[in-house]
Amino acid sequence: MKKPISILFDSYHLYHLPQFEPLIDLLSNDKRFDIYHSTSRDIKDEEYELCSKILKKKPGSFIFSDSEEKRKKVIRNLNLDVFICGWSRYKLEDFVSDKTLVGMIYHGIGVKPSYWLDNNDRLDLRFVEGDYRINQLRENGICLLYTSDAADE
């Protein structure tokens, strides 16, 4: 069997976690993936503790550190195949190597201006749902490519 695909879900904030949980659970049942999770050290202590408590119970390995600088180094040293984030307002390039595929899963309901204003050149993929969100991104100059016919239904 070839080496599993390493994928980290970076729940920078607690509110990113609900978008990640179904994927974490799904991929954890597939031997082709090594699952990792993490959350920022730059958030409030209460939020960090709550998010950490949830992530430690999820399948896979919880990556943590006592500082954000150390967390960056630990994650970067994993030399991940895939890095999934919930927003791009931080230096993604500090967490990943050049070979890492970086994806962002949009969170919440509705469309937020941050979808097209918070662009990070290190993002390779954006996961969105629904024609309305896709059209909003296109209207604001974000180049999109469908990955599923589901958006056309």
Model-derived segments and spans:
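A short beta-strand/loop micro-motif in the catalytic core of glycosyltransferases
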Residues: I84, D124-G130
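N-terminal pre-catalytic "stem/leader" segment of glycosyltransferase-like enzymes
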Residues: M1-R76
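A short, active-site helix/loop in glycosyltransferases that binds the activated sugar's phosphate group
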Residues: V128-L144
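A short acidic (Asp/Glu
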Residues: P18-E21, E46-L50, D94-V96, Y115, ...
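Short beta-alpha junction loops
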Residues: T39-D45, G108-I109, D131-Y132
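Extended catalytic core of nucleotide-activated donor transferases of GT-like folds
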Residues: E49-N119
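Conserved small/polar residues in nucleotide/adenosyl-binding loops
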Residues: Y146-A151
